[in-house]
Amino acid sequence: MSQSTSVFRRNGFTFKQFFVAHDRCAMKVGTDGILLGAWAPVAGVKRCLDIGAGSGLLALMLAQRTDDSVMIDAVELESEAAAQAQENINQSPWAERINVHTADILQWITQQTVRFDLIISNPPYYQQGVECATPQREQARYTTTLDHPSLLTCAAECITEEGFFCVVLPEQIGNGFTELALSMGWHLRLRTDVAENEARLPHRVLLAFSPQAGECFSDRLVIRGPDQNYSEAYTALTQAFYLFM
């Protein structure tokens, strides 16, 4: 089924159970975040952490996918984005389950005593390069404020022994991220390579790491079929969220 353009509003994106305004956020709602929020394993989780929450998209998706006992912390450094995430969450059915923190994750994590069963992040991945239009967008896109070793260290400090740390990255950067994670003691447990269609090479990769060793499951997801409509696999993954699926 093709995605209807009517799910877009001028300042945000309407899902089946919630609306995400993102006009005050550097990075907008996009396929990467939707993929990650729908894909991350949630079975048995009790507490979740969203690092770099932006508009609150991932926290809201996790809230929709989990039962009412699951608590979610969403940490966002940029104050305007954090304020908008809070507004989005306040207007959702899960305001009492999601706590937004305007903070630097590197400092916030040192003050935490709880551990998380699921940590999720759609992290920055560009090295400093082409100048961005705003400092906020630069912060969201570049690894200058949160590099990958620091991100992996943060997650390691607050994850449960059997928990999962999930990210979405461009394919090649994801391969480098995996090598780094393995060198730091993480174990790759789930990997899904994402291609736009059958004729294209994968352009994104979904990765789930755990402190605990175990079998690694990998697969491939194609977003669109030969007719350019969403594939059956992509529809099955995301239909709980997209308004017209």
Swiss-Prot record:
Assigned keywords, A-Z? Cytoplasm, Methyltransferase, S-adenosyl-L-methionine, Transferase, tRNA processing
Q: Which InterPro entries match?
A: DNA_methylase_N6_adenine_CS, SAM-dependent_MTases_sf, Small_mtfrase_dom, tRNA_Adenine-N(6)_MTase, tRNA_adenine-N6_MeTrfase
Q: Which compartment or compartments is the protein found in?
A: Cytoplasm
Q: Name one GO cellular component term.
A: cytoplasm
The cross-references to SUPFAM superfamilies, in alphabetical order and at most eight, read: S-adenosyl-L-methionine-dependent methyltransferases (SSF53335)
**EC id:** 2.1.1.223
Any one GO BP annotation for this protein: methylation
Where is coiled-coil annotated? none
Instruction: Look up the domain of life of the source.
Output: Bacteria
Keyword S-adenosyl-L-methionine among UniProt keywords: yes
Q: Name one GO molecular function term.
A: tRNA (adenine-N6)-methyltransferase activity
The UniProt function text for this chain reads:
Specifically methylates the adenine in position 37 of tRNA(1)(Val) (anticodon cmo5UAC).
The text of the family note is: Belongs to the methyltransferase superfamily. tRNA (adenine-N(6)-)-methyltransferase family.
The name this protein goes by in its record: tRNA1(Val) (adenine(37)-N6)-methyltransferase
Organism, by scientific name, is Escherichia coli O1:K1 / APEC
**Gene name as annotated:** yfiC
